[in-house]
Regions:
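Non-transmembrane alpha-helical segments in soluble domains
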Residues: 12, 16, 24, 69-76, ...
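Sec/Tat-exported extracytoplasmic proteins
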Residues: 1, 19, 34-37, 60, ...
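Mature extracytoplasmic/periplasmic domains
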Residues: 50, 59-119
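Extracytoplasmic/periplasmic, Sec-exported soluble proteins
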Residues: 3, 7, 50, 59-63, ...
Length: 144
């Protein structure tokens, strides 16, 4: 096998046409592609993976903090959070929203991995002292 590309989305058409047999991707993207081709599957490496989350924040300089709070509160409504989870394939930490999800979404292990799978995963933290090293090797890797 060979490395086909280092991009965030070039794998999509390649895996759907069969030009790739494996790709590293975000779980939400994998779910989207699996909806197009149910013969594909998502696997979390047995060694684990990185954990990530999207967050909503309000900058201290926000021109309309009240509007920002209203938006966040809207996004946190269980019915809205459940729809976001279903439509975008992003897991929700909102327990009330989770309870509104259909069984096929609740049982989707790419959205809601088992506790044992999560124990093998870890969050990513910034390592400013390593940025120059990462940048040097990434440039070497991605430039061929």
């Amino acid at each position: 096998g060979a490395i086909a590309a280092f991009t965030s989305d070039a794998w999509r058409p390649q895996i759907l046409t069969g030009d790739l047999t494996v790709a590293m991707c975000y779980s939400a993207d994998a779910n989207e592609v699996i909806r197009e081709d149910p013969n594909l599957d998502y696997a979390l490496p047995t060694s684990g993976s990185s954990l990530w989350m999207d967050t909503l924040v309000i900058p201290i300089t926000a021109p309309n903090p009240a509007g920002a709070y209203a938006w966040i509160n809207f996004m946190l409504r269980p019915d809205v959070a459940a729809r976001i989870c279903e439509r975008l394939s992003f897991a929700t930490p909102n327990r009330e929203a989770y309870n509104l999800l259909p069984p096929e979404v609740k049982n989707n292990t790419s959205l809601f991995p088992s506790e044992s799978a999560l124990e093998r995963c870890e969050g990513l933290i910034p390592l400013p002292e390593a940025n120059a090293i990462y940048d040097r090797y990434w440039t070497k890797l991605s430039s061929g």
